[in-house]
Amino acid sequence: MDKKKVVLAYSGGLDTSVAIKWLQEKNYDIIALCLDLGEGKDLAFVKEKALSVGAIKSYMIDVQEEFANEYALMAMQAHTLYEGKYPLVSALSRPLIAKKLVEIAEQEGATAVAHGCTGKGNDQVRFEVSIQALNPYLEVIAPVREWKWSREEEIAYAKENNVPIPINLDSPFSIDQNLWGRSNECGILEDPWAAPPEDAYEMTLALEDTPNKPEFVEIGFEAGVPTTLNGTAYPLSELIKTLNALAGKHGVGRIDHVENRLVGIKSREVYECPAAMTLITAHKELEDLTLVKEVAHFKPMIEQKITELIYNGLWFSPLKQALHAFLQETQKNVTGMVRVKLFKGHAIVEGRKSEYSLYDEKLATYTAQDEFNHDAAVGFISLFGLPTKVYSQVNQKKVEA
């Protein structure tokens, strides 16, 4: 019987390495796909490892700039903070991984794609809904969800089949990282009362170890896109990396969160998102300067829905595409400079300016240079309060009667 081809999202870890052998037993030829999302792994090694374990072909694709410009940028412009805290680090990368899985599957003539998600996480939903949206005819295989092995059983299978066991396997943590940040769960973090140990963090310093003097960064934006740091122009992926280092040194972006997962359980997660939190903070302040009141007040409702759609794996849904169009329209005049103080875990905006600023000092000032028409206030108040006044008059008459 001819073997079918499957494209596997490959990380180099134990689960996806074992999945190669498991899929071989199911009569598949495995094509491994590893993406460089800015996590800092030795991906050349990961690519070769897939071949050594048994994949017939292995791809390593650098998608950092695509991830920055088409995924992280939208998240920043929409100020996506799930449940007010989590900037969607992992959720943002899943639709891009799904997109590349589908592209390689179509290119290679594969009939299926596979991922290494468990049956109790959000990522299985994000991958599979995205894949269905992009190519509903591809079979999706989830080996880890299907085999239901304990960790001990999985290690035993790996040893029996000569699958290399990672040297960091004894680490209690489950970590996912990309340009936009780092997520960490499992181990002691499963106890919501336990303080995260310092070795749970990598991108940020503890407050006790951060500099005792603040550092200032000036972030330049053009039409809602961060383009410069302290006067130096960067591609967006490099700007994010540079800001991760700057803000992380000051302990910015540590998040300890008990979140409501899509699959119905609560999960305690620890995140590090120094650049994401700094950029979201700065961008929001520039919007406050440049957006008209009606748009500024309406946009958070759209942001909330976009955040939910991305978290729930609906990146490729029609509603998300429609809301993205609204978001892009709001960014046309979000151009300017924001000065941010990085100090002891905080990113504090201390200045903002824009050629499209709607702040008029002559109207806002209380000095002799005031140009606001105070006489207009009387008529405005009369008309603005008229519905309330009429309602009160009518109901007071009923009480008196």
Swiss-Prot record:
GO cellular component: cytoplasm
Residues annotated as binding L-aspartate: 118, 122-123
Catalytic reaction annotation: L-citrulline + L-aspartate + ATP = 2-(N(omega)-L-arginino)succinate + AMP + diphosphate + H(+)
Keywords per UniProt: Amino-acid biosynthesis, Arginine biosynthesis, ATP-binding, Cytoplasm, Ligase, Nucleotide-binding
Claim: Iron-sulfur is one of the keywords in the record: no
GO-annotated biological processes: argininosuccinate metabolic process; L-arginine biosynthetic process; urea cycle
Pfam families (alphabetical): Arginosuc_syn_C, Arginosuc_synth
Annotated pathway: Amino-acid biosynthesis; L-arginine biosynthesis; L-arginine from L-ornithine and carbamoyl phosphate: step 2/3
EC number(s) from the headed UniProt entry: 6.3.4.5
Source species, domain of life: Bacteria
A GO term, aspect molecular function: ATP binding
Positions annotated to bind ATP: 9-17, 116
Gene3D superfamilies given in the database record: Argininosuccinate synthetase, chain A, domain 2 (3.90.1260.10), HUPs (3.40.50.620), Single helix bin (1.20.5.470)
Residues that bind L-citrulline: 86, 122, 126, 174, 183, 259, 271
SUPFAM superfamilies given in the database record: Adenine nucleotide alpha hydrolases-like (SSF52402), Argininosuccinate synthetase, C-terminal domain (SSF69864)
Cell location: Cytoplasm
Subunit description: Homotetramer.
Similarity remark: Belongs to the argininosuccinate synthase family. Type 1 subfamily.
PANTHER family on file: ARGININOSUCCINATE SYNTHASE
Name of the protein in its database record: Argininosuccinate synthase
Gene: argG
